[in-house]
Amino acid sequence: MKVRELREKFPGLAQECYGRELVYLDNAATSQRCVAAMDVLSDVSINHNANVHRSVYKLAAEATKAYEDTRDFVREYLNARSREEIIFTSGTTFSINLVARTFGEKFIGKGDNIVVGESEHHSNIVPWQLLCERTGAEIRVLPITPRGDYDVERLRELVDAHTKLVCVAQISNVLGVINPIDEIVAFSHSKGAKVLVDGAQGAVHLMVDVQKMDYDFYAFSGHKMFASKGTGVLYAKKELLEEMPPFLGGGEMIGTVSFEKTTFAELPYKFEAGTPNFNVIPTLKPAMALLKETMEDAELTENLESINRYVYDALMADDRIVLAGGKAGVENRIPLFSIIVKGVHHEDLALVMDKMGVALRSGHMCAEPLMGRLGVTGILRASFAPYNTLEEAEEFIKCLNRAIDILL
């Protein structure tokens, strides 16, 4: 597939910004939506708009089928053993909080510890802090190496017989560095600890086989994968889910209810209380199918690799710029670049480049502990997707140079 052909599936890319062609480079925050996903959203919302799992009439049956067919698709996509291991949520943040409130509340207590990575997004830090405040457990911080990936040798010192859970991202949303998850999982399991992997960035760029990778928990968001907002997924091993108490109480997650006793539904519905976001969840299927197609397409893969090499080399060659995680090299990273420009505030850079038609993220990236490690309050981030072109990468570097010249 040609990149131009792929771009036609994303009408949002064709718009202008301040009279210039939009160069959208905030894909790590959220991707643009593909037409196929929006068509499904429109179809379900107009033609099959009925609550799922509750009624026998035709519209409800059709809505339920669309919802549950999506679960089957996600199970196959991740190579999970069972559809019961796929929980739909609103996003990665909700998924991680679900694990903290269920697995955490039941299995983690005073005297136990949780290992959390230094470069994690706040959504994989704060839920564990709150859990430790409630239970008296301890958080241990797994540092990054000078390259920006997690320090496996330090992990061997941190994980002990009291470690119940290790929480790490597949790929940092700031550094773009691919972490040594296989080693982390293998060592953690050898000590009896479970592992939660934040796949918010990883699921976008890497094919995932949860059985082969032996993840205990895996969380990601469809809105970064061409689907609608509100399309979160939590994968968890069935044997863990069976032992975990419900997170929220209400409709759908019950077996029977009386004032004397309530029993709970079978998996996965025990963790899907209330009316689900039934009109957007089905957008996961066409969106993730398209994403998989891009990962398997040689021409599109080569295009992203070319972008990665070009931008990496250009940033590393400029002595005015510090590329966070640059020491990891180009081979162990995705095309996500967080930069610090000496003497220039990241917000000013973002504002100037916005007027040039380049959409970038600025700020602390919801990773303040990592900002502290880097010695800054914020950065400027450019993140590329399969529909971005090498010409857009060149435009990014050209506009960045112009913006720096204006601001210095």
Segment roles from a protein language model:
Residues 1-408:
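Pyridoxal 5′-phosphate
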